[in-house]
């Protein structure tokens, strides 16, 4: 009975060994992942610089600076008058 059960097990084990290693199925390649990450970083950097340059060229910073200067000047004058 033991021989009768061990022969099929031996056949299955031999077939698995002779079959060889299983093909790689979608194992991520580290270099391609790093390349994608680098590309994402470069894209993000370009977009960030574009936004910064757009803000620098807009009128908003100048208007904000002028508003703060004017408000600060008015507060300063009020404090001088009240003192």
From Swiss-Prot:
What are the annotated GO cellular component locations? Answer: high-density lipoprotein particle; very-low-density lipoprotein particle
- State the compartments where it is located: Secreted
Query: Which interval of the chain is the signal sequence?
Result: 1-26
Return the Gene3D superfamilies for the record: Apolipoprotein C-I (4.10.260.30)
The answer to whether keyword Signal applies is yes
> Which terms does the UniProt entry file under GO BP?
lipid transport; lipoprotein metabolic process; negative regulation of cholesterol transport; negative regulation of lipid catabolic process; negative regulation of very-low-density lipoprotein particle clearance; triglyceride metabolic process; very-low-density lipoprotein particle clearance
GO molecular function annotations of the record: fatty acid binding; phospholipase inhibitor activity
Q: Which Pfam family, just one, is annotated for this protein? A: ApoC-I
Keywords from UniProt, A to Z, are: Lipid transport, Secreted, Signal, Transport
- Highest taxon of the lineage: Eukaryota
Statement: the UniProt record of this protein carries the keyword Transcription regulation: no
* Family under the similarity heading: Belongs to the apolipoprotein C1 family.
Q: What does this protein do?
A: Inhibitor of lipoprotein binding to the low density lipoprotein (LDL) receptor, LDL receptor-related protein, and very low density lipoprotein (VLDL) receptor. Associates with high density lipoproteins (HDL) and the triacylglycerol-rich lipoproteins in the plasma and makes up about 10% of the protein of the VLDL and 2% of that of HDL. Appears to interfere directly with fatty acid uptake and is also the major plasma inhibitor of cholesteryl ester transfer protein (CETP). Binds free fatty acids and reduces their intracellular esterification.
- List the PANTHER family hit by this protein, alphabetically: APOLIPOPROTEIN C-I (PTHR16565:SF2)
Q: What miscellaneous comment appears in this entry?
A: Apolipoprotein C-I is present in acidic (APOC1A) and basic (APOC1B) forms in P.paniscus, P.abelii and P.troglodytes and perhaps also in baboons and macaques. The two genes for ApoC-I arose through a duplication process that occurred after the divergence of New World monkeys from the human lineage. In human, the acidic form has become a pseudogene sometime between the divergence of bonobos and chimpanzees from the human lineage and the appearance of the Denisovans. Pseudogenization resulted when the codon for the penultimate amino acid in the signal sequence was changed to a stop codon.
What protein name is recorded for this chain?
A: Apolipoprotein C-I, basic form
